[in-house]
C-alpha cells in the first residue's frame, strides 16, 4: 500500500466547499457539488478496481482510518483544509491510499483527465504511511483580496471583494499587529463552529499578517497554525471597519478579551478568500498545529454564500 499526497488548486465559485455534504431530502447524495466529491469520483474513475462500490461504501475508511462520507464508485481522500463554500485554493493538500504502481509524478496528468476544468491536481508525491495532511506539522497561508477601485473590475469579481469605503492602511496594519501571536480568537469565530460543540477552544497562533497593495487591490495575507470557522473572514471584516475609522486599532485588544462574537466586525464574503499554501516544514512542531475543528453542513454553507 502507498500513500499519495496531492497538491490541489481550485476555483471554489461553483462548489459548496471542500467537504462532501451528508444527503438530505432536499439535497440527495451527489446533488451538492464539493471539491472532495469531485476528486473522489475522479480517483474512482482512474482506479476503478480500488473504488468503493455498493454496500462497501458503508465501511470505507479514508487514510486516517476514520469514516468519511463516500458514494459508490469513489476512492476516499482526506483533505488538509476544509474550505468553505465559494473559497478558492492554490495549494490545498489531500492524500489517498492506493495499491497502484502508477509513479507519483504521473498522477496529476492522470487524475486531471477526470476532473472539471475548475479543479486541478498540481503535484503528487509519495509520502510515508504515517503522513496525515490535517494533523502533521504545517502552517496555513491564506490571502483575502479586496478590490478597492471606484468601479468593480469585472475580471476579478469572482476573486476579490469590492469595497469602496475609504481605508487608512496604517490603521489596518496597526490593528493587524495586535492579532499576531497566540490568542483566544473566540470573538473572531462563527458561534456555530463545531469546535465548541466538541469541547475544543479557539486558541490559535497567527504568525504574521501582511497588508499588500497590488494596483487597485488590497491583499491581506495571513499565516498561522490553524483557523476556525469564518475566522479569517471575520478578521478581515474587522480590519476593514478599523481601516475606515469606525473602530480604533487598539479595540482589537478589547475584542480578544471579550470572547464575544458581537464585539468584532462583520464576516466578509467568501469569494475574496484563497488558501495559498500549506507548509509542512519540520521547523513547525506538531504541538504548534491546530486542526480547524469544523465539518461543514449545508446549513453552515448557506450562511457563507
What are these regions (language model features)?
Residues 1-305:
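Structured-RNA-binding interfaces characteristic of tRNA pseudouridine synthases
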